Amino acid sequence: MTNRRQFLKDVVAGLALAGAGPLLPRLAQGAEAPSMGPAGLPAGTLESSLLDALPGKKPLIKRTFRPPNYETPLEYFNQAFTPNDAFFVRYHHADIPEVDAQAWRLEVGGESVEKPFTLTLEALQKDFEAVELAALCLCSGNRRGLFEPHVAGVEWGLGAMGNARWKGVRLKDVLARAGLKKEALEVVLQGADRPLVATAPDFAKSLPVWRALDENTLLAYEMNGAPLPHWNGFPVRLVVPGWTGTYWMKHLTSVQVVAQPFKSFWMNPAYRIPKGKFAVVDRFLSQESDTSTPITEMVVSSLITNLKAGQQVRQGQRVEVRGIAWDGGYGIQTVEVSSDGGRSWAAAELGKDLGRFSWRQWSHAFAADRKGVRTVMAKATNRLGSSQAFELIFNPAGYHNNVVQRLDLQVV
């Protein structure tokens, strides 16, 4: 009898032979295509990045189809929260489950708990206090496609991120029911998605126990007031505010507490940065080596959301520059904008503070008083005094690209 995994392998093979036409996500018809990404992406990236709509999603920028990796077009970042149907999609494996909420179970256990147990979705929602917070989910490789020289990996542009209100229960409350032993070191997380090839490593990650016990680390079951979308982790996913999305395990099925560093391809060698390259406050000490460290918290960054490179504006026009800024949860202190290529800077007006893990909207206006090229830049600084980089900090996996953005406008 053919099992589901073999069936999916056969489907993939069939798609390769048949051109994948009928089973591809539908291509948006009759709509103006948004920008597929900034200039500078590797050759062939823009040509292959079609505007596709996965079931239940608006047309998003397709970076890969198998596994599905789709980024959010820029226009959806001109609001406080990213709509669920426009939220980016990130998977490492192509065997993505259709989870029955009634049949879903979460196994909580491991060598370093006193009382392992199993939770249903109903019990998770009824037995523990519900909390809600705003937090940015950002892929570790966002803007990887802008690295020079280019590096291997999904060639993300600007949109492998989204801001949402997440509702769920604190992971620490669930772990308290299990009872942690004193030797507990890491919490291992496993989701229901699987590789198509049996020899490929399952996507499993761990958190240091102190981060798992942080009051802001959630087992989320709602996103922007609705159940989690299928493509964003239904029915339950981990939310680790301030840390990059690699830890935000989707379709969560297992939480295991262990007394030793967890060994997994996705912990080492994947998702590592050279030691000492970036100023990191939240370190994952049990997973560090002499030369590298796991990527953890997001670095301070910003994005101009209402203008595009090469856009024309009229001489004498007052040009509004709008955008968003974020960091690893310390809070944005200032955003400065330059309209003359960095020779002078002015403070932008910050929008409503939605919480330290949310992005912060900002705006600034300048007069386009002379014809020619006007180079617009934006630079964010957080409450620790950390600012964006003016030059790329190269690392072989293409992480933490927070270089100050430069957009050339044409004043005509």
Indicate where each model-derived feature is located.
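N-terminal export signals
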Residues: 6-29
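Structured, non-membrane catalytic/scaffold regions adjacent to prosthetic-group chemistry
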Residues: 31-412
